[in-house]
């Protein structure tokens, strides 16, 4: 049985995560106090210290992005591309800063990578986040400066000489994406890398007061989600019997029923529905448990939800109903089942 960190359902693949679109800004945020000095006006290099990356940190820590990354790391084409880049980068660059690798082979491999649906989904969500985040506008502009790549290379060279980071970077160089995934959730390593790059840590990551109590509270509050995700029927029953909220929402507005149906844990879904869980609960993207079950082809969960009054016509933020989501994900058996119910 997978752990809860390995079993977090993705947002149905039609989601663009554009519900929090913000106006773009070209105003350069101020550097954090105590940060190294910014480049002078005559230095066109990239000022890593002038940008708040907390928004991107939130995206990268999104459970759906993490699971996409894990799936991508297992893709043979992506690993081939990563190995090719690893072989070329350590050998140095030609004049002009271009890595020494075969462009034709690179393009062929990249084309294979782009055929990976998980890669396209993650690239789209990250791209949207970059474009919509006003803090990232000056960062993206700065990346266009030739001096930025030189400054980035200098930072990387310094990191490789850091006694704490050197073995970690060496392991990532040798192991590729799979080794990188090992450190994805390591807050200490990520903080050290951020510090070495001069990237300010978001305020939510710097608050150290009473961390253990907060974490314990989170775990206790999410026990219903955890047991439902893991298919732990007895644990779920015990959690509900001890006062657990059957319709408790996580930070994305997802209830335990969303999780159970996303994973196909039909017995847990039945327990929740028997306890009176809302079959039409919506998350922040207005996805219902039926959207999740339909998108992942969980036919038994779809049938169970329909028997308990789940709405086939409920639309999410992209104006997609469960039938649309199932069709987008080529879940043809589920499409037939939903269409049959819709026309009854």
Swiss-Prot record:
- What is the top-level taxon of the source organism? Eukaryota
Show the segment(s) annotated as Disordered. 1-50
Chain intervals with Basic and acidic residues compositional bias? 13-27
User: According to its record, how does it sit in the membrane?
Assistant: Peripheral membrane protein
Q: Where in the cell is it found?
A: Cytoplasm; Nucleus; Plastid, Chloroplast outer membrane
Q: Where does a 1,2-diacyl-3-O-(beta-D-galactosyl)-sn-glycerol bind?
A: 225, 248
Q: Which residues bind a 1,2-diacyl-sn-glycero-3-phospho-(1'-sn-glycerol)?
A: 296, 298
Q: Which SMART domains match?
A: ANK
* Keyword field contains Calcium: no
Keyword Chaperone attributed: yes
Choose one Gene Ontology CC annotation of this protein and give it: mitochondrion
Tell me the ranges holding the ANK repeats. Answer: 219-248, 252-281, 285-314, 318-344
PROSITE patterns associated with the record: ANK_REP_REGION, ANK_REPEAT
Pfam families referenced in this protein's UniProt entry, alphabetically: Ank_2, STI1-HOP_DP
Q: Which GO terms describe its biological process?
A: regulation of DNA-templated transcription
Which keywords label this protein?
Answer: ANK repeat, Chaperone, Chloroplast, Cytoplasm, Lipid-binding, Membrane, Nucleus, Plastid, Plastid outer membrane, Repeat
* Subunit composition and interactions: Binds to chloroplast outer envelope membrane (OEM) protein targeting signals, as well as to chloroplasts. Binds specifically to two chloroplast glycolipids, monogalactosyldiacylglycerol (MGDG) and phosphatidylglycerol (PG). Interacts with APX3, APX5 and TOC34.
Entries under PANTHER family matching the protein: ANKYRIN REPEAT DOMAIN 6, ANKYRIN REPEAT FAMILY PROTEIN
The domain section of the record reads: The ankyrin repeats (ANK) mediate interactions with hexoses-containing lipids present in organellar membranes (e.g. chloroplast), such as monogalactosyldiacylglycerol (MGDG) and phosphatidylglycerol (PG).
Function field = Exhibits chaperone activity toward chloroplast outer envelope membrane, mitochondrion outer membrane, endoplasmic reticulum membrane and peroxisomal proteins, by recruiting specific proteins containing a single transmembrane associated with an AKR2A-binding sequence (ABS) and subsequently binding glycolipids (e.g. monogalactosyldiacylglycerol (MGDG) and phosphatidylglycerol (PG)) present in the membrane of the target organelle.
Q: What is this protein called?
A: Ankyrin repeat domain-containing protein 2B
Native species? Arabidopsis thaliana (Mouse-ear cress)
